[in-house]
Amino acid sequence: MATIFAEIIEGKRPGFIIFEDDNHMAILDKYPIDTGHSLVLPKIPYEKITEMPKNEVAELFSLVPEIANAILKATGAVAFSIAQNNGKEAKQIIPHVHVHIIPRYADKATLWTKRRIPSDDELEELRQKIKNSF
C-alpha cells in the first residue's frame, strides 16, 4: 500500500523536505504539535520498526541529533521530544516508520492533543530556515 510518505519520497506529492540522503528523508509535519515538528523516515516503507534490520534502525536514529540541532537553531526552541509509534493502537497514523522530532519552547506549554494547521507558505518559509541551519 502506497502511503503519503511513499508518494513524497517518489516525488508524486509535495512535501516540505528539510533533509535527504540516499536512504532517508526528513520532512516538516503537515499537522504539527508545535512549530518545527518534523518526521525522519526511511525511504524503504517499513510499517513498524520491528520489521527493520538493526543497522537500518541505527542509521535512522543516528540522523536525529543533526536534524534536531538544525530545527532548534532555526526555530529558537530550547529542547525537543522524540516519539516513534508502532501500530494504530499506539496512535501510528501512517503505516510507514517515522521518528517525530517535536521542538519545545521555554515560553509556552505545548499540548500533544492540539495541533495547528499552518499554511503551505509558513511551512515553506520554515523549511528553508531549517535547511539553512545545517
Show the residue positions of the predicted features.
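HIT superfamily nucleotide-processing domains
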Residues: 1-134
